[in-house]
UniProtKB/Swiss-Prot annotation:
Protein name: Cardioactive peptide CAP23
Annotated function: Has excitatory effects on a semi-isolated heart from larval Manduca sexta, causing an inotropic effect at low concentrations of peptide and chronotropic and inotropic effects at high doses.
Keyword Iron: no
Family of this protein: Belongs to the GBP/PSP1/paralytic peptide family.
Disulfide bonds: C7-C19
C-alpha cells in the first residue's frame, strides 16, 4: 500500500498512521 497517498479508496489516514473507513 502507498501510505504517501493514503489508504484503500474509501479510507482515510488517522493521526496514528492507521486507516479507517469513512463510511
Amino acid at each position: 500500500e502507498n501510505f504517501a497517498v493514503g489508504c484503500t479508496p474509501g479510507y482515510q489516514r488517522t493521526a496514528d498512521g492507521r486507516c479507517k473507513p469513512t463510511f
